[in-house]
Amino acid sequence: MSLRRPSPDGIAPHEYNFKKKRKVAEICQALNTDPIDVAALRRMAISEGGLLTDEIRCKVWPKLLNVKMDDLPPAPGQELREDNEDYQQVLLDVRRSLRRFPPGMPDEQREGLQEELIDIILQVLQRNPQLHYYQGYHDIVVTFLLVVGERLATALVEKLSTHHLRDFMDPTMDNTKHILNYLMLIIDQVNPDLHDFMQSAEVGTIFALSWLITWFGHVLADFRHVVRLYDFFLACHPLMPIYFAAVIVLYREQEVLDCECDMASVHHLLSQIPQDLPYETLISRAGDLFVQFPPSELARKAAQQRAERTAASTFKDFELASAQQRPDTVLRQRIRDRLRVEERTKSILTKPRTNRFVKLAVMGLTVALGAAALAVVKSALEWAPKFELQIFP
């Protein structure tokens, strides 16, 4: 099943403006409702065009994350950077983030924002010692900083870090790798041929790591596309980024299948995200896949796959194979085989037209079976473990 379809025709400017004005009015209505209609805001964030402007995002993103505007963190003090174990790594990452700032921004303004970016990250980590910094985290934080400013960004990022991004901020990458495994599960459900090709290429899922842990902020050049995806992700389940990653791979099905079936070729192709993707179409399809294959089903399939790979679950198959190799089992089977062969031999030899060559062939077959039986018995004695079978019923 392919997800690639022609992109829809462009909307006429006057029609687009009408839809935009109507959507802005609906967002304002949801914001002015008492209580605020968060469900409607989520629908607006997901639907075509997302939240439209940064001005609207400043009002809606806090509602989507349940952040209260009158309870923002205080401004950080100078002591924040002193004796902070993450400071040097954060500093290096932020210094390398030049391309995440708008082109043409004056150096002085950009450098000031970079200092604010460092403070946001360190403050969130200081207030939440259970969180661990990872490279790529700053790509998410800078998006919030550029849209909503330092103080509100600190509150939003803190809430995001303790919820949506929590698995990425563990001491190990175990949970991150577990989420990445969902990528292949989704692809397998939609397009088994593509899944099998990628498995044969042994490409794995590492190509999608930066997509996932930066919410695509690190790999998309156009900031408009980044904030559009953030609208979508903030309004959805925390696993939605992995569904979006899956639809990108599925959309590029033909490119992947045209590749050499080896890890290097497929990894190189998928690591380079085209900048002209039909984002609205892919967002819609990611939502469809989420409904069709919800996280609960993916978790069940992932658990089933893990169980099939564990020693305990494969024990019965191994036990059966070993039992069939045990000397007593082998001998009983070979005796039955020999008796059957002898019966067939007797039948053939009693036929008046049976010639000498047939008799010799049958005798040779009987001898060969006997030799095979001895070889199997010997191998069983050498390696078959002596299981306490009653331990694993």
Please report, for each region that a protein language model flagged, where it lies by residue.
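Extended, Lys/Glu/Leu-rich amphipathic alpha-helical scaffolds
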Residues: 2, 15-22, 33, 40, ...
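Active-site-adjacent structural elements in folded domains
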Residues: 104-110, 121-128, 190-202, 207-215, ...
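Long, repeat-rich segments with strong aromatic
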Residues: 207-261, 364-371
